């Protein structure tokens, strides 16, 4: 048998442009966010407090007692509130999401699930920072909005209520008007 002849033609060499991979794209500077929220639930009410970073144990205990008393006074129901602490970021790792958008998405989903499970009708945000993180809006104490059939009331922080009888009286006026 005879082997076939190889014919070599002059073909032009085509160069394809180099396309950078996705990981080489420039990323915008993302500011990391840290917070700790205490969520107290009793009946169909929820109280969300932004826990200050450097809070001593006695202050934290007084804040918890005040939150419990507020919820009991609103609903006049026996029993103790369910309390949950939500921290962000979820865990420490260089690749873990820490930005405001991820925090907001996680927190909204988490709180929405808690509201649905308990059929919540009233959410009290204790302090502006609690409202900023949990509600995603910057409201001042005394402001109230309604979303999806749930009343959202922003009030003073528990620390402010503990230290100021005038703020505490104003808070009870806000609750009475709800």
Where are these regions (language model features)?
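A polyanion-binding, active-site-adjacent surface
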Residues: 1-178
